[in-house]
């Protein structure tokens, strides 16, 4: 029933690898070291084990009353196995992603049924998602730099607003209101805009104020996309070069770079969602920065169900390349800036281990996610600083509805942000 529903496909766009059947059950066969542990996997696993369970992103050092708040928006991910079911339930209840009959009853049923399999995936990557930890580290670095770059709008404070796990977007807004901020910046952590990611988070902000029946006490604006920011591009390029150097020197020029982004149902694309073009823009700028040293392709991961999605799919592309003798592959998560289930499980385990063995690949590695790279924190600070200096409420793109938009809330959200007074 679930896989046949076209409406469910929109929800699966956000859920991605979380809602897929694992390719393996239990322990997999031992893999060659280069397959099991890329630099990305080692760094992510080590950092998570030491820090993920102790980090409290909203707790920041005592300081002067904040003047400017930066709300870092993302889907989020369960930190523990016990949080998986609530995460899935909130996801299936999100009407920006899907509308179903008796949704309030069906969502808990679906979540409960999927929980054991998804918990197993999280168990395989250490017991939970590290995305909250990484967002906290990035936020700390960002506001420290912002206080130096923009003393007129300091002190700056970051807030984390997740859609499906705590701290929820609504909880973050309440904290921001209590803090008495003068200005609030909704800052999506997805470089490329999609209605199902950034759009859903911005809708949550509009809904919060609409439901409480009060106007904001702070002035809102938003950084709603940043696919070609120079420092973002530099970070990706640096991580690609670093990982390319781990391939045997005699094979290095043969490596195919596969930029992998979360796929999207074609029904969403055909409504005019700008996501595919913006991901392509990021890829183009990264390869331009690198000087086109290797062949490359943009591929799409996490397709679920029988309805058409953006392709080619990452796993099918890997199979096809190996069949054609291109067995040295570098995976680059181009739409994700922090490690989570789709990098640590789908790319590192499903593709780099299990699929690599099936295909007889020689070397499959993954470029490390941006995570704790100081240059990435500098990129975030520069984005916010430039946004403040521009005195703009949002990008010009945000004011344009998808030509075939079917969600009336999107129009109200756009009106909410474009009507703010700075």
Curated annotation (Swiss-Prot):
Name assigned to this protein: Ferrochelatase, mitochondrial
Organism listed in the record: Mus musculus (Mouse)
Pfam families: Ferrochelatase
Positions of the catalytic residues: 229, 382
Record's bilayer topology term: Peripheral membrane protein
Tissue expression from the record: Erythroid and hepatic cells.
Cellular component aspect of the GO annotation: mitochondrial inner membrane; mitochondrial matrix; mitochondrion
Alphabetically ordered keywords of this record: 2Fe-2S, Acetylation, Disease variant, Heme biosynthesis, Iron, Iron-sulfur, Lyase, Membrane, Metal-binding, Mitochondrion, Mitochondrion inner membrane, Porphyrin biosynthesis, Transit peptide
Biological pathway: Porphyrin-containing compound metabolism; protoheme biosynthesis; protoheme from protoporphyrin-IX: step 1/1
Cell compartments where the protein resides: Mitochondrion inner membrane
Cofactor note: Binds 1 [2Fe-2S] cluster.
Disorder association: Defects in Fech are the cause of a viable autosomal recessive mutation (named Fechm1Pas or Fch) that causes jaundice and anemia.
Function: Catalyzes the ferrous insertion into protoporphyrin IX.
Binding locations of protoporphyrin IX: 114, 122, 129
Transit peptide endpoints, chain numbering: 1-53
Induction or repression: During erythroid differentiation.
Residue sites binding [2Fe-2S] cluster per the record: 195, 402, 405, 410
Gene3D superfamilies: 3.40.50.1400
Catalytic activity: heme b + 2 H(+) = protoporphyrin IX + Fe(2+)
Single GO biological process annotation from the record: response to methylmercury
HAMAP family the UniProt entry points to: Ferrochelatase
Domain of life: Eukaryota
